[in-house]
Amino acid sequence: MIKLIIGKKGAGKTKRLVELVNSAAETSLGNVVCIEKGGTLTFSVSHKARLIYADDFSICGYDEYYGLLAGVKAGNNDITHIFGDATLRIGSRDYAELAAFLKKVEELSALTNKNFVFTV
């Protein structure tokens, strides 16, 4: 399942995402992963969740972002939730590419039965 948190800059998308990450980290029977562009969520996200910085892996573009998601999932079958912050900054502002990316992630979600949440 894919969920999108959509809103304008400053609308509280990241704050809502952090709440969801921390809630999932407390209640999930598996592992929780949060992917963000830089290191802004370091002290906001629970230590029980795995925080990954896309910039550490030079991720730019939706194909690379999908590769990261698939690789993270392939490396750990115990992951139940994957959260992504600043999706447009990691990928691009090309909405056609965003739609294609979300379709691929939806297929990955259906195949692996994992939950994905992104801020847009």
For the regions a language model picked out, list residue spans one by one.
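Hydrophobic anchor at the start of a short beta-strand
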Residues: 30-32, 80, 116
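Conserved P-loop NTPase "ATPase switch" module shared by AAA+ and STAND
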Residues: 77-93
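A general secondary-structure junction signal
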Residues: 36, 86, 118-120
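Conserved P-loop
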Residues: 1-73
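Substrate-engagement module of ASCE P-loop NTPases
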Residues: 97-120
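A structural signal for short coil/turn segments at secondary-structure junctions
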Residues: 27-28, 76-77, 109-112
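Residues at alpha-helix caps and immediate loop-helix transition turns in enzyme cores, especially N-
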Residues: 16, 94-97
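A short acidic (Asp/Glu
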Residues: 45, 93-94
